[in-house]
């Protein structure tokens, strides 16, 4: 259960920033969340960042807020971030590290030694849940995190993060770092307990770096081969659909989780199904993979999935 017992700090002078650096070095870990002016990491400018070294131990460091009387100088902020992120003895904890690392890379900051709570969540249940920070805070802590709309508004009048007051930004950003740290404490031990560490350590985490480099540098593709593969995959899906229709006895939408659930568990009476909170049959990847050895129809249905 999430409970904030004290107010978060806003760091606006270098002495306080230095104190946080010493604290982080002593503990050997820190949750970090960057705040920017764009969802596109390649285009984003760093407006500030938040840190957490424990539950309720979080702060926000403003850098480039408009009309702010006092905030940390960009040079001091970059020096701090570089020294922390490039120190392999300090574990950095992110939620969607790929985004933060792309932002930091623009300032020649590389990230060494890190965990990513979004990837940990994905490793624990790739098809069974969403993996946003807000969703996981609600799921594991019964906490409704402050939304961006609450501090920035929405629609055409929505403010960019640099236009938001430091006071409002501080509460929002520091909470994100605090939640990230709490999630890490909850989810990291489960990797070992559920024997999924190797999936995270050898597949998901390394792959994120590859995808980051692809987003940053682009990739070369053979357009002709790509088109041939697209046609091949499309034909395979159509063939599998026809097989399923023959087995079931009627056509249905293989892209509809609701219809697949009804076919598998209501019509074919396959055992082992589970329902979502809304009362519909669950047909996430975890459920379908579990049932693969039971139902040929299910196995073929799963092969048409694009996620």
What kind of feature is each model-predicted range?
Residues 54-92:
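Nucleic-acid-processing active sites and adjacent nucleic-acid-binding tracks
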Residues 13-17, 73-78, 97:
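Amphipathic coiled-coil/heptad-repeat helices and related helical stalk/stem segments
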Residues 3-65, 85, 112, 128, ...:
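Conserved "right-hand" nucleotidyltransferase catalytic core of DNA-directed polymerases
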Residues 31, 90-97:
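Acidic beta-strand-to-loop metal/phosphate-binding motif
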Residues 110-125:
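Conserved beta-strand -> loop -> alpha-helix junction used to position metal-binding or nucleic-acid-contacting
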